[in-house]
């Protein structure tokens, strides 16, 4: 029995079905997909969440399909400019002098155009040659580290890692902001090892993309393939609690009780909710060791976001997404370190931050069928606190701050908007079914990654975890897919099943990786800085 049809639950269901394990997936909502679900309105097909996929078919989302022999079942699409940094043009900037209201810095898909991005970004943040050299050393070092060097930074922060390389606040601000999109946490709270692991793989794969059909194409495809293999998938079926055998010395799962009181028997149950929700509400703390309960209570989730879905009658953006951070007097291009910290401190106080960071994928630029002909769909979000934080600024104020920010970087937005659907934190919390509504239920902080991350198994026999709650590494949905694979493997081992051999890496891929590593050695030797020794 798998509870929840998000990426983690859908992946686990498919892999167990492929292994011949009878499996039922239950989803409380009437549509599959969790935060990757979709709704339709006036010819637009709209994501519930706000998504792009860092490694596309090259990463865990594709690995799930390759494990079941369906590697090409989802079509991940890229655009010429995969993203674009946008800021209001400052009076002294070249964009302002050229008469433009917005400074645009394209992020290309083609690696050959990356030097142009570096040049434009360096000019935009007024880098001196010394500062540019420091930034180059930082990124060269990151890309040429060994896996062992990366793992040594698991339990220290990204702030500690960056400090020996540069103190240039705009460089730190933009790098920290982009990694903040990965983890929905400030960079001084993020595990350096986790951030480096994710950034290196994203850079080397160069597969940031979006699936044809929308985000729902991923869980929908997993579930369709699982059903073809005999799995049962039920929607509109909520789980009230997970049931245990009576009188067992060690807790053992016996099934679930649904919201309508129906009991479904199962000797294995996979929860894709948060560890906190699973322990305290679905099972009950009395059934777990005290130390495990305390750990579940202490788990730190990520922040969440307010969202808006904007339907336009005209195409206003050509890139695959736009990102940035905008304030009244300051933005990410001219911040100080204090500005960056105050941005997140305000969020923890329940106040709209002085700089509003935004992230806005444009799904219809990847798949034109997601909007009527000639139209465009924007899905924008801005960071917000989880529901356990008392709001000093009411929810609608957060939503309006997000919209005000987007209007400043998308000229003509209001004139061409057909409708704008706003999603509050409360809505997202109810939809995904995780207490407080964190985007990542076990946040990737130094004490919650690597060896210190909760495992996919629990002290109760037959109870497992999958999704962004336990196990694995990665960004968002890719973390969930990797966790799903880890969970399925653990279940099969515990059931005494043989794990199927992994498909070996193709010789050309291995040769390319080896050649890339060799080519990087001279550059690494010449440019790498020596950060503080990990103790």
Summary of predicted features, one role per range:
Residues 1-127, 486:
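N-terminal glycine-rich phosphate/pyrophosphate-binding loop and immediately adjacent elements
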Residues 244, 492-530:
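Active-site-proximal substrate-binding core of FAD-dependent oxidoreductases
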Residues 173-185, 353-359, 411-473:
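A glycine-rich dinucleotide-binding beta-alpha-beta segment and adjacent secondary-structure elements
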Residues 240-371:
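Mid-domain catalytic core of redox enzymes
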Residues 81, 85-191:
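Rossmann-like flavin
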Residues 50, 470-491:
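A conserved FAD-binding loop/helix module that cradles the flavin
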Residues 315-316, 347-355, 390-431:
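Flavin-binding catalytic cores
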Residues 198-259:
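Helical element adjacent to the flavin cofactor pocket in flavoenzyme catalytic cores
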């Amino acid at each position: 029995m798998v509870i929840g049809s998000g990426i983690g639950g859908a992946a686990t269901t498919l892999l167990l079905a492929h292994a011949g394990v009878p499996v039922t997936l239950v989803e409380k909502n009437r549509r599959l997909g969790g935060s990757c679900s979709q709704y339709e309105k006036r010819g637009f097909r709209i994501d519930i969440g706000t998504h792009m996929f860092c490694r596309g078919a090259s990463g865990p989302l594709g690995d799930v399909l390759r494990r079941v022999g369906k590697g090409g079942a989802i079509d991940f699409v890229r655009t010429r400019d995969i993203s674009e940094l946008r800021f209001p043009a400052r009076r002294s900037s070249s964009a302002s002098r050229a008469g433009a209201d917005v400074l645009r810095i394209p992020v290309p898909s083609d690696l050959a155009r990356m030097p142009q991005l570096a040049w434009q970004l360096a000019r935009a943040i007024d880098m001196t040659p010394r500062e540019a050299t420091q930034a180059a050393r930082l990124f060269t070092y990151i890309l040429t580290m060994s896996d062992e060097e990366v793992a040594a930074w698991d339990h220290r922060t990204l702030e500690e890692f960056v400090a020996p390389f540069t103190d240039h606040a705009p460089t730190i601000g933009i790098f920290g902001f982009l990694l903040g999109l990965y983890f929905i946490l400030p960079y001084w709270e993020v595990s350096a090892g986790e951030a480096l692991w994710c950034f290196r793989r994203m850079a080397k794969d160069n597969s940031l993309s979006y699936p044809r059909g929308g985000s729902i194409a991923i869980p929908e495809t997993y579930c369709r393939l699982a059903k073809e293999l005999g799995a049962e998938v039920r929607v509109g079926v909520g789980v009230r609690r997970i049931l245990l055998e009576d009188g067992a010395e060690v807790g053992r799962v016996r099934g679930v009780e649904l919201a309508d009181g129906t009991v479904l028997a199962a000797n294995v149950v996979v929860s894709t909710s948060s560890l906190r929700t699973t322990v305290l509400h679905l099972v009950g703390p009395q059934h777990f060791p005290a130390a495990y309960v305390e750990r579940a209570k202490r788990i730190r989730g990520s922040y969440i976001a307010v969202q808006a879905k904007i339907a336009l009658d005209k195409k206003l953006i050509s890139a695959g997404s736009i990102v940035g951070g905008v304030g009244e007097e300051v933005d990410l291009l001219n911040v100080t370190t204090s500005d960056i910290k105050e941005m997140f401190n305000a969020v923890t106080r329940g106040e709209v931050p002085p700089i509003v960071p935004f992230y806005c994928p444009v799904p219809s630029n990847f798949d034109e069928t997601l909007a009527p002909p000639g139209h465009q769909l924007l899905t924008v979000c801005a960071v917000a606190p989880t529901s356990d934080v008392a709001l000093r600024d009411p929810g609608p104020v957060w939503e309006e701050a997000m919209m005000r920010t987007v209007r400043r970087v998308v000229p003509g937005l209001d004139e061409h908007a057909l409708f704008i659907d706003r999603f509050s934190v409360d809505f997202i919390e109810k939809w995904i079914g995780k207490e407080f509504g964190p985007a990542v239920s076990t946040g990737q902080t130094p004490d919650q990654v690597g060896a210190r991350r909760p495992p996919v198994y629990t002290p109760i026999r037959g109870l497992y975890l999958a999704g962004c709650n336990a196990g694995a590494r990665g960004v968002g949905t890719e973390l969930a897919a990797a966790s799903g694979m880890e969970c399925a493997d653990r279940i099969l081992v515990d059931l005494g099943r043989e794990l199927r051999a992994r498909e070996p890496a193709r010789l050309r891929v291995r040769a390319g990786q080896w050649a890339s590593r060799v080519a990087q050695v001279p550059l690494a030797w010449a440019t790498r800085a020596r950060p503080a020794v990990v103790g």
